[in-house]
């Protein structure tokens, strides 16, 4: 390793070279996160509900988390989205249009005991799911 009065250029070049060994840096620079992201880097996306699914929580929890399979409008990709709220799944029917967003897990991945579920439902037919669960709004008939 260079160390001396005039070693700055060598140190800088070495640092630039070895940064590529860092997986996070390499993925970020190559844009691999956006390439593999169904939402293509967007914060939210619209999709059509294909089916309701119950996903078992990981150990040590024992529950069936209510989720939906959604086909995105922008690219046709299918994702699973969690329905947050008590009885929220009852407000969502097949062929409804939903808005989904990231669920907020570490490094943009799954959260808590829900493996493989990276998204949550935010709106159903343009109405907030939280408002529907609270009873503050009614679901429009399409």
From Swiss-Prot:
MF-aspect GO terms: rRNA binding; structural constituent of ribosome
Ranges where the record places region Disordered: 1-44
One annotated GO biological process: translation
Transit peptide listed as a keyword: no
Compositional bias segments (type: Basic and acidic residues): 19-38
CDD domains xref list: Ribosomal_S23
Keywords in alphabetical order: Ribonucleoprotein, Ribosomal protein, RNA-binding, rRNA-binding
Domain of life: Archaea
Feature: compositional bias, Basic residues: 7-18
Gene Ontology cellular component list: small ribosomal subunit
Keyword RNA-binding: yes
Family: Belongs to the universal ribosomal protein uS12 family.
Described function: With S4 and S5 plays an important role in translational accuracy. Located at the interface of the 30S and 50S subunits.
Protein's UniProt name: Small ribosomal subunit protein uS12
Species, as recorded: Haloarcula marismortui (strain ATCC 43049 / DSM 3752 / JCM 8966 / VKM B-1809) (Halobacterium marismortui)
Protein encoded by which gene: rps12
């Amino acid at each position: 390793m260079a160390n001396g009065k005039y070693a700055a250029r060598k140190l800088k070049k070495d640092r630039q070279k070895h940064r590529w060994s860092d997986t996070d840096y390499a993925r970020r620079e190559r844009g691999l996160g956006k390439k593999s992201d169904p939402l293509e880097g967007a914060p939210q996306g619209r999709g059509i509900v294909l089916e309701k699914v119950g996903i078992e929580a990981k150990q040590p929890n024992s529950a069936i988390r209510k989720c939906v399979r959604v086909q995105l409008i922008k690219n046709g990709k299918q994702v699973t989205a969690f329905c947050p709220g008590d009885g929220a799944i009852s407000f969502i029917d097949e062929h409804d249009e939903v808005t989904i967003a990231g669920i907020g897990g570490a490094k943009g991945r799954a959260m808590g005991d829900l493996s493989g579920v990276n998204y949550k439902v935010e709106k159903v037919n343009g109405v907030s799911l939280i408002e529907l669960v609270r009873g503050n709004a009614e679901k429009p008939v399409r």
